[in-house]
Amino acid sequence: MKIRASARKICEKCRLIRRRGRILIICSNPRHKQRQG
């Protein structure tokens, strides 16, 4: 899980999800998991 100032999609399979006011990126590739903090 990377925590970044700007979370963005890295590949086609990345999905952008808003959960409790946070932006999460969920992907089939575990390296692409991000959270905007």
Curated annotation (Swiss-Prot):
Spell out the molecular function terms from Gene Ontology: structural constituent of ribosome
Q: Which Pfam families match?
A: Ribosomal_L36
One of the protein's GO biological processes: translation
Localization: Plastid, Chloroplast
Name the InterPro entries on file. Answer: Ribosomal_bL36, Ribosomal_bL36_sp
Keywords, sorted A to Z: Chloroplast, Plastid, Ribonucleoprotein, Ribosomal protein
Classify the source by domain of life: Eukaryota
The entry's cellular-component GO terms read: chloroplast; ribonucleoprotein complex; ribosome
Q: What is its main location?
A: plastid
Provide the family line: Belongs to the bacterial ribosomal protein bL36 family.
HAMAP family of this UniProt entry? Ribosomal_bL36
Name of the molecule in the record: Large ribosomal subunit protein bL36c
Species: Populus trichocarpa (Western balsam poplar)
